[in-house]
Amino acid sequence: AYNYFHFMKILVLGSTGMLGTYLVRYLTDISSRLDNSENLELFSASRNGNDFYCDFSVTETMKSILNDINPNVVVNCVAITSLEYCERNPEECLKINGYAPGYLAEICKEKNSRLIQVSTDHFYEDDGPKAHKENDKTFFLNEYAKSKLIAESEITKRGRNFLILRTSIIGLTKEQRSYLDWILENINHSREVGLYFNAYTSLIHCKQLSRIILELAQNKHLSGLYNISNKNVFSKGDLYLAIAKRFGVEPIYKKEDLDSRLLKRSISCGLSPSKIESKSDLS
């Protein structure tokens, strides 16, 4: 599928986070399998090294990196994702998650680079297992969700050639303990856990999202806001049970309910990918 790949220079920002790690690994693999590996040039930037050092709180750093590379596509995976940290540090959260992406969109517009912004699914009222569409009403219960909504607004105002992807990811990395790590750890040690059957999601694996991001990067006709998610909406409790079943383990759990207001986070995070499916070959 990639033998007819048009030349592309891709910059991944936030390349040492969970999604960034998967994306860089995937793009490196694709590049090695191309007839002409020079057709896909990959650059990565993060606060932890990689090709370039990038501190998102210093906007001039972004500008100098884009000037050095002149990328065709910039994928922004940078975000402070800890809800607790965002609540304790709202100004830093707004700067990194909210306003920096808007500035990045402006630089991309100047450089004629395509921006792919990774957003979130934390935007909805408690409406059960609903598969939310892009035009459904949004709201926020915490600083993290507020900052990601601001990013969407800033990019839309200041950018030109961009894609905003609302999504929720699952995966494993060596660098940080993920939700999937927590599930596997508890299953392997037969620990009793509290499972929430009123918290809904449409999680997509980082591997699959990485593949989709590359396909979107090549599709120059798409722009705007899209949900990129699992086709199904399921509770986090059901996800836990499904993974346990796959490993042939009988899980020990007690059923619990989440109160979104008390917790200060949305629990109805289902997404519908019908818009992107109608406009592309993605599945």
PLM segments and residue spans:
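NAD(P)-dependent short-chain dehydrogenase/reductase
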Residues: 153-201, 206-208
